[in-house]
Amino acid sequence: MAEAGARRPFFRRRKTCPFTGTNAPKIDYKDSKLLMRYVSERGKIVPSRITAVSAKKQRELARAIKRARFLGLLPYVIR
């Protein structure tokens, strides 16, 4: 069968959405600390393929970030 020195191939575990499930944080435009985790160092919204956020929650997140920017809670551009 398998040799003694043979290794299993590496399979990356599929990440789950951090906003679904029990005791998951609610997406709120006033929670700037949470929203800053999903904004890059240049101020752009990080895509869901990197953050593993589901499509529905990514839309909610983008809407909350844009609302927080409009109200002055988050910067548009970080220098």
UniProtKB/Swiss-Prot annotation:
PROSITE patterns reported in the protein's UniProt record: RIBOSOMAL_S18
GO BP term, pick one: translation
Source superkingdom: Bacteria
Record has Transport as a keyword: no
Pfam families xrefs: Ribosomal_S18
InterPro entries according to UniProt: Ribosomal_bS18, Ribosomal_bS18_CS, Ribosomal_bS18_sf
Alphabetic keyword roster: Ribonucleoprotein, Ribosomal protein, RNA-binding, rRNA-binding
Subunit structure: Part of the 30S ribosomal subunit. Forms a tight heterodimer with protein bS6.
Protein's UniProt name: Small ribosomal subunit protein bS18
Gene giving rise to this polypeptide: rpsR
